């Protein structure tokens, strides 16, 4: 029988899981929400992969939490895919993050027009999104169907990503739109470029009281960042709407059927923290769809132009299959790590597509980290 890295080096993660209330790594990192398969397909004989995307507003503690979780496993058992900081600062463009914050500041000070700011922001967001989108495309051929047996073995590999492509292709553009430095047309152009959602896409969003969030962000030192409280409020709002949108879609919501329930073109007020899938289906007015009832997108009869409606169809199609989890960051770094480990027990694995997929994926992740990680 072929041997895969996760089968050889699972003991470190097993021990960590047991010490935190899991019987073994099988329960710590094996999905619960799976259905029994009636017959075994060739794909189901392949090892499984767990992909976890740690996302949400900047400054919550995502990177620290992720690094602590990764430290629980062996090098071949769990692989971390960091933010592509070197690409943003050097390879893709010069100091992209600093350029974004400087442009917003100049707009806020009246030094440049909204149109000039939008040109810079749109270009910068292309740079921010490129590493995520291309990595997703390279990974896609190795991702098979979601594991279909409650008796599936522990994953041969766990990949922990610092953000999903929707961060750069949806959430941050939408927040910049709320800040007045990007057009709604540009936001929907990015939406049209979001890659198809792969099976087993587990996204972890965060909850943290705003005052605590501001305090953490003020203490953080990232190259090029400014403490922009208006932007922090905007991105918190967008991620809250994102969580609501996934719940809305998975609860059977249809933006086309409910569009008439939106009134006016006002931006939704500040929302509460992202919520789990529990509770009633959100109103369309509490989802991302409400952002796009903008005059620039509407025909004279008040309906969306078809090209923009098609973009919202893409948005719905991309978000509906996602498995969203909420992590409470209002605790110590170790507490956040343990809570994240607990969340993984309910996440969805996928089979890989070839016997060589696991080492290929490992190599892809390490190449990404080596070439574009912050240490470069």
Swiss-Prot record:
Q: Where is this region: Disordered?
A: 1-44, 260-280
- Report the GO molecular function annotations: ATP binding; thymidine kinase activity
- Indicate the residues that form the catalytic site: 83
> Where is ATP annotated to bind?
56-63, 216
Which positions in this protein are listed as binding substrate?
101, 125, 222
User: According to its UniProt entry, what is the function of this protein?
Assistant: Catalyzes the transfer of the gamma-phospho group of ATP to thymidine to generate dTMP in the salvage pathway of pyrimidine synthesis. The dTMP serves as a substrate for DNA polymerase during viral DNA replication. Allows the virus to be reactivated and to grow in non-proliferative cells lacking a high concentration of phosphorylated nucleic acid precursors.
Family stated for the protein in its record: Belongs to the herpesviridae thymidine kinase family.
Q: What is this protein called?
A: Thymidine kinase
Q: Which organism is it from?
A: Human herpesvirus 1 (strain SC16) (HHV-1)
